[in-house]
Amino acid sequence: MLISDTLRFMGAGSDSSPETIELAETAIEKVRSVSTPVSRLTVINSDNKELLRGADIEKHLCGCSKAFVLIATLGPGVDLMIRKTQLQSMREAVAVDAAASACLEEYCDEICAKLAKSNSITMRFSPGYGDYPIEVQPQLLAFCGAEKIGLTCSGYMMIPTKSVSAIIGIKDENYEELNR
């Protein structure tokens, strides 16, 4: 899955040349060698109109009185690697950037899989999806204590760039408190 996602993010297909597949595999190895994935989860009431604005997030959280707010990052080493690689080879930089995106998705999927073991959850829903405004990003990060994992926001862009914020609804019938 990781290799196919990396190829997809590179704009390549599953019928890619052996050279392209090798480029993607090498990029994944490079990203994993510098990646320091870390995340924070916080529970929020789904009626929090300050952080959960818009009809789309309201619809997404239908049947959920609570939700997880997830923030996750691969760490600053990945951003640095992408920038350094851009100076050497844009072809490799595209692959490294794609691999980083795929690794971040994989990390978030692993977190969601753990949550799903004890909760019935929705898919992730991030600021900028539908009418859920990207402008809520700084408030979500503050709500989760993003500074504790080295995650900040410039405008509405997260730093490090290979980072995610997302809302994950917790279906009412299966809500279980976080053991933290």
List the model feature ranges, each with a label:
Residues 1-88, 92, 96:
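Active-site helix-to-loop segments that bind/position phosphate- or nucleotide-bearing substrates
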Residues 30, 49, 59, 66, ...:
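Context-gated lysine
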Residues 43, 47, 82-86, 108, ...:
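Generic alpha-helix signal with a bias toward terminal, lower-confidence helices
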Residues 78, 104, 175-178:
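Residues in flexible loops and secondary-structure boundaries
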Residues 121-180:
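Short terminal or interdomain "cap/linker" segment that borders an active site or interface and mediates
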Residues 88-147:
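Internal, well-folded beta-alpha domain core
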